A protein has these predicted regions:
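Conserved acyl-donor/pantetheine-binding loop and adjacent beta-alpha core of acyl/acetyltransferases
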Residues: 70-108, 126, 142, 146-173, ...
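Glycine-rich phosphate/pyrophosphate-binding loop shared by adenosine-nucleotide-utilizing enzymes
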Residues: 9-11, 65-69, 104
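Short acidic/polar active-site loop segments enriched in Thr and Asp
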Residues: 138, 184
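A short beta-loop-alpha structural element at the N-terminal edge
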Residues: 11-24
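Helix-loop element at the rim of GNAT/NAT acetyltransferase active sites that forms part
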Residues: 15, 26-41, 49, 212
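Hydrophobic adenine-recognition pocket in adenosine-nucleotide-binding enzymes
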Residues: 16, 109-111
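Active-site rim helix/loop that mediates acceptor-substrate recognition in acyltransferases
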Residues: 35-77, 86-95
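Conserved acetyl-CoA-binding loop-helix of GNAT-fold acetyltransferases
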Residues: 111, 117-132, 139-142
Length: 217
């Protein structure tokens, strides 16, 4: 269980409890306004995540309000192409979560807009890293949404955007902070998610517990 004060004690980062599901639902709906409704998680989904893998569900709280949340499951390294809905068993994780899996798949993270820019997402990644270490897992794996594509979608394809992003020709408001937090690029995942502003794409990345570990070794 994680329960720690962060940012000079003004926020609490902790393992999610059953009573947090409604607050997590609010964070989800607020943070992903362009995501198709069929891919938005609700309190019932979050309740199931907490029931199945409580250690992997985290929240950030301030003055009694949930202002950030992160959802994960355990799995084996995904060798094949997959979609967001496939990765999390249509949001429920019941069949996707493998209790003996050696990777942590982070399939959701959000921080309310008025609390962004303070490093809360980085704190959540650090906490997930702590959970990975405690459970003896290999790494976190995520599919970061290419949020920045929406601003340039009239000037380039999503494929070109990902190629240029991978060459560090520009930054992305989601992918760049994730890389700065320690994640390593694997590959773009096209048609991964139903979000036109992201070009329906995400970047598959991993953050190993042992920094000497590299995929393909």
């Amino acid at each position: 269980m994680i329960n720690t004060k962060i940012l000079d004690g003004s926020y609490t980062l902790r393992t999610a409890l059953a009573g947090d599901a409604a607050g997590m639902e609010f964070v989800q709906a607020t943070c992903f306004p362009t995501l198709h409704a069929s891919e938005l998680m609700n309190r019932d989904h979050f309740s199931n995540h907490i029931k199945l893998f409580s250690e992997g569900q985290l929240v950030v709280e301030k003055d009694g309000q949930i202002v950030g949340a992160a959802s994960t499951l355990r799995c084996f390294f995904p060798e094949h192409e997959h979609t967001f809905m496939e990765s999390c068993d249509n949001l429920w994780i019941t069949r996707a979560h493998k209790p003996d899996g050696d990777w942590m798949y982070g399939f959701d993270m959000g921080v309310l807009p008025e609390h962004r820019g303070l490093g809360l997402s980085k704190e959540l990644y650090k906490a997930r890293h702590q959970v990975c270490k405690a459970l003896g897992l290999t790494a976190q794996i995520i599919a970061g949404m290419t949020i920045g594509y929406g601003k340039v979608k009239d000037t380039m394809t999503i494929e070109e955007y990902c190629e240029r992003l991978g060459r560090n020709e520009f930054t992305d408001p989601t992918i760049t902070p994730q890389i700065r937090a320690g994640f390593r690029w694997i590959k773009p995942m096209y048609n991964y998610i139903n979000d036109p502003e992201s070009g329906n794409a995400s970047i598959l990345m991993y953050y190993p517990v042992d920094e000497k570990f590299f995929i393909g070794q």
